[in-house]
Amino acid sequence: STVCKTQTVKAPDGTVVGEILFHTGSNGFCLNREDMLKQISEAFNSGNYNASLSLLLEEVEPEGDVNTLIGSMRELSRFSTEFATSNESRSRNVQKAAGLLNCVILEPGEELSYNELLGPRTEELGWLPAHGISGGKEYIDTPGGGICQVSSTLYNSLLLIGPDIRIVSRSHHSIPGSYVAMGLDATVSYYGPDLVWSNAAESPMFLFAYADMRTKTVYTFVYGTQPDDGTHYKIWSDT
């Protein structure tokens, strides 16, 4: 196959977050089932149990059309939060977490875990000590502090998609953060709470994430080919 077209995904500041590559299809071959069954039946009925069979292959064209696929690709949701008050370490953790989420494909029926995508948060793996909640009661500096802002940003993006996304696991913070409305956060800990979601649609979804270090804003985007039926979802907090 050869690349037919590239669809570029950009953040509001114009930064290229990722690219979706569309490949031209090529014809394949399919065994003519009726002809094969006929040959088997004839050989069996004639008592020729060692008969040689001729395979009749028929050329088959791709079911989909690349141009149709490109035309149906659209942004399903996006959400952003600001981390302007974060220090350098926390900001770098936010940037690293967004980078690990960027360009992730979610196949139909597939389930993804935020903890599995990011992996263990240790200084050896490049995570910097920054404020994080310890024991549900206080803030302490811990490697990876700040990644819950990215998981919360992603959680809101997923909610905006509607029923095509199923939230499998999500927990709120014991101490509410200021970057999202109360009740719309998603806390994570590598050996504890996790944000887990699955694709309930019949086609893949594409996740992109980006941290703008100039404006101190983290973005999450989800793209897919689900038909636009005019339904749009809003989320709010009622506390």
Located regions from the model:
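Well-ordered beta-sheet/strand-loop patches within structured domains
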Residues: 2-239
